[in-house]
Amino acid sequence: MIYVYNTLSREKEVFKPITAGKINMYVCGPTVYNYIHIGNARSAIAFDTVRRYFEYRGYEVNYVSNFTDVDDKIINRAQEEGISELEVANKYADAFDEDTLPLNIKPATVRSRATEVIPEIIEFVKDLIDKGYAYESEGDVYFRAKKFKGYGILAHQDLAEMEANAAGRLNDEETIRKEDPIDFAVWKNEPREGVISWSSPWGNGRPGWHIECSVMAQKYLSNTIDIHGGGIDLAFPHHTNEIAQSEARTGQKFVNYWMHNGFVNVNNEKMSKSLGNFTTLHDMLATYDDPMVIRYLLTTTQYRRPINYEASTLEQARLELERIRTAYRNLMFRAETSEPGGDEDVETLIEVQKKAFDQAMDDDFNTPNALAAIFELVSIGNTYTERNTVKVDTVQHLLGTIADLLSVFGIEGLDGNEELTTKQRELLDKRVLARESHDFERSDLLRNQLKEVGIFVEDTPQGQRWHK
């Protein structure tokens, strides 16, 4: 059984999909007004890993995520850059795709944009008004939060406290327009010329942020979905408001399992622009040459826990991943000289660690414990390759198991060929030829040239091995 921590109940619950063997999963994507930061990247990687594990366990996952491509932040950025809101959204949506591609994040089944579902949003708002859950006020439409029973339960927020906090954030105009301080906008009036808007029964305007995700989840999945994911900062108000408006409209439970990933801290401090430690994925990729290390780092902590990012943790992640890659290459190397058959003692050890991996991931996707099982496999492989004789079935079993388990983490290309530059490959090939022709002076020269480009070689009775 797979156990999932449900933010709504604050407990780990046995996962039971609505439809056997299938999972409907919605994950909040970014507001595309800037390059995504490392916290956004963590969320994308965390839920990609969850998705991959479900697929590894045989589930068919319908994975929907969004771009919020109409928002105050996008409007402000468009005015700053002197381009249209659509151009801003397209620029940073494309940047998201380009920056997440090297991290090996699987494409969503559907990647929807808010601007693609405006007619559905308007119909949704109409239904809320008809049911008495929303009201129009000077071109804005607000949701009556207190009318929805259980409002705030996801974030375990006290209604009186929410009301006091909301009142402190309102300006005079909002105070006049709202019936209650905690009411939230599902449609916003937009009277300004040249600012993106759509015609509606309440005048020109645009959707509120929260309603966009409700509409996309219902359109591309169903009224009730298995899993809704996002950063913990979205639990209130975003996901709280999604629940209220979705269930008010349909009368059905919106989400069975709410999953939230923790924050990324930078040098043990909360990431923020005011502290000057705001780190975008775009900048990281421009300065760090191995995206898989970034991905690996962001899976070393269980998804609900905060994770610390700094130069030392990135270097530790690089060393750990290189340890795995080196062991994998050594196994591939020994496979070339292996004998037929298998070694039962090692086969048993492999299955023990595979079971340990599954048990860890079944426990609310406990990636640190799952990685521990992978490193046990690495140790088993390292010990095995030191034997004088190895068996092909066992070597292939080790290779296949390590690759399968790491693919759940999105870590692929373990043979290292994809990591090598053309120059590095050429130097390695030339050195093999030099050794075969007993040209040891040239072999040593090539060893030094390889060292200069970051490749270290060692000679063994079975031939040349290399690592970074």
UniProtKB/Swiss-Prot annotation:
Q: What is its EC number?
A: 6.1.1.16
Provide the reaction this enzyme catalyses: tRNA(Cys) + L-cysteine + ATP = L-cysteinyl-tRNA(Cys) + AMP + diphosphate
Q: What family does the database annotate?
A: Belongs to the class-I aminoacyl-tRNA synthetase family.
Record's InterPro entries? Answer: Cys-tRNA-ligase (IPR015803), Cys-tRNA-synt_Ia_DALR (IPR015273), Cys-tRNA/MSH_ligase (IPR024909), CysS_C (IPR056411), Rossmann-like_a/b/a_fold (IPR014729), tRNA-synt_1_cat_dom (IPR032678), tRNAsynth_Ia_anticodon-bd (IPR009080)
Metal-binding among keywords:
yes
GO BP terms: namely: cysteinyl-tRNA aminoacylation
Pfam families tied to this protein: CysS_C, DALR_2, tRNA-synt_1e
The answer, when asked if NAD is one of the entry's keywords, is no
Residues annotated as binding ATP are 273
* Molecular function terms from GO: ATP binding; cysteine-tRNA ligase activity; zinc ion binding
Cofactor comment text: Binds 1 zinc ion per subunit.
What are the alphabetically sorted keywords of the record? Aminoacyl-tRNA synthetase, ATP-binding, Cytoplasm, Ligase, Metal-binding, Nucleotide-binding, Protein biosynthesis, Zinc
The record's listing under PANTHER family reads: CYSTEINE--TRNA LIGASE, CYTOPLASMIC (PTHR10890:SF3), CYSTEINYL-TRNA SYNTHETASE (PTHR10890)
Tell me the residue numbers annotated for binding Zn(2+).
28, 213, 238, 242
Map motif 'KMSKS' region onto the chain: 270-274
Which HAMAP family does its entry note?
Answer: Cys_tRNA_synth (MF_00041)
Q: How does it assemble?
A: Monomer.
Gene Ontology cellular component annotations, sorted alphabetically: cytosol
- Cell compartment(s), UniProt: Cytoplasm
Q: Which domain of life is it from?
A: Bacteria
Essential cofactor(s): Zn(2+)
NCBIfam families associated with the record: cysS
Q: Which Gene3D superfamilies match?
A: Cysteine-tRNA ligase, C-terminal anti-codon recognition domain (1.20.120.1910), HUPs (3.40.50.620)
Species for this entry: Leuconostoc mesenteroides subsp. mesenteroides (strain ATCC 8293 / DSM 20343 / BCRC 11652 / CCM 1803 / JCM 6124 / NCDO 523 / NBRC 100496 / NCIMB 8023 / NCTC 12954 / NRRL B-1118 / 37Y)
Identify the residue span(s) of motif 'HIGH' region. Answer: 30-40
SUPFAM superfamilies in UniProt: Anticodon-binding domain of a subclass of class I aminoacyl-tRNA synthetases (SSF47323), Nucleotidylyl transferase (SSF52374)
Q: What is this protein called?
A: Cysteine--tRNA ligase
